[in-house]
Amino acid sequence: MTAHPEFAVIGAGAWGTALASLYAAQGRRVALVARDSTKAAALATTRTTPRLPGLRLPDSLAVTARPPEAPVTLLAVPFQHLRETLGRLPQGNGTLVLCAKGVERESGALGPEIAAEMEPRRPCAVLTGPNFAHEIAIGLPAAAVLAMTDDGARRDLVQHLATPRLRVYGSADPIGAALGGAAKNVIAIAAGAVIGAGLGENARAALITRGLAEIARLTEALGGAAETISGLAGLGDLILTATGSASRNYRAGLAFGQGKRPDTEAGVIEGIATAPALLARARATGCEMPVTEAVTDLLAGRITLEASMNRLLRRALRDER
């Protein structure tokens, strides 16, 4: 690279490649960082990836295996590799933007909590929302939310990340934004499972709505704002992920509902690792998450789908909240 990039995008999967292509196509200096030199060389040569069929990487997009210094580094690696990836970044004071969605399996930590531990001196933001990678990559219109506690830095970064086809809203609640993006994957598995088992659209709508309520409860318990979950980071992302056929978590649920194993070759299914970690975090705060508990037990083989649905339906009746 002859000049330092404006953006370094760590992770050359579908989401990282889509973001890198989006910003490179806008004339930004962008470096896409693959996990090893072999993959980087292949991407640099072919300018294509099987993760995003039909997309050709912009000629200006640099591809490398070594993370460069950059004013803004977007981390789009599978969530369970976030801590390791942060440990390999070059020293610097550039802003970190967390683009992966999940909860750390071992600790139950959210992305902003991991970043605060690993890189306490760096500004950190969460970029999330209802965004399928393939649609972003080809420039279809979309909206996202950029969550960061520093008001001035957030306003500047929103301007930096918005494009004519991606509208970016600001939020001062990175915990709520991160939790909404992580937990919706679990609820999407539940939604897919009931459709796969032929239990109907009513059941899916009920699970999505009650799943949203339990995400909001945990958000408040962790110090976030419940209203964050009614926006793009929560409701918007949940609607897309729990109904869209391109959602890996929804498709995993469909497979479970049909008595099959999910296809893990198409990409990481974050909700599978997130469910038990999220449930443990909820229990530690005394927060009830019955849908998440049902998904966790279903994934572990401790309960059948029919039994889990009966357990949810037979909970004590009460006012909705």
Curated annotation (Swiss-Prot):
Pathway: Membrane lipid metabolism; glycerophospholipid metabolism. It comes from Acidiphilium cryptum (strain JF-5). NADPH binds at W15, R35, K101, A133, R248, V268, E270. The keyword Lipid biosynthesis applies. GO terms for biological process: carbohydrate metabolic process; glycerol-3-phosphate biosynthetic process; glycerol-3-phosphate catabolic process; glycerophospholipid metabolic process; phospholipid biosynthetic process. InterPro entries: 6-PGluconate_DH-like_C_sf, 6PGD_dom2, G3P_DH_NAD-dep, G3P_DH_NAD-dep_C, G3P_DH_NAD-dep_N, NAD(P)-bd_dom_sf. The active site is at K184. It is found in: Cytoplasm. It is an enzyme of class 1 (oxidoreductase). GO terms for molecular function: glycerol-3-phosphate dehydrogenase [NAD(P)+] activity; NAD binding. This is Glycerol-3-phosphate dehydrogenase [NAD(P)+]. It comes from the Bacteria. Sn-glycerol 3-phosphate binds at K101, G129, K184, D237, S247, R248, N249. Belongs to the NAD-dependent glycerol-3-phosphate dehydrogenase family.
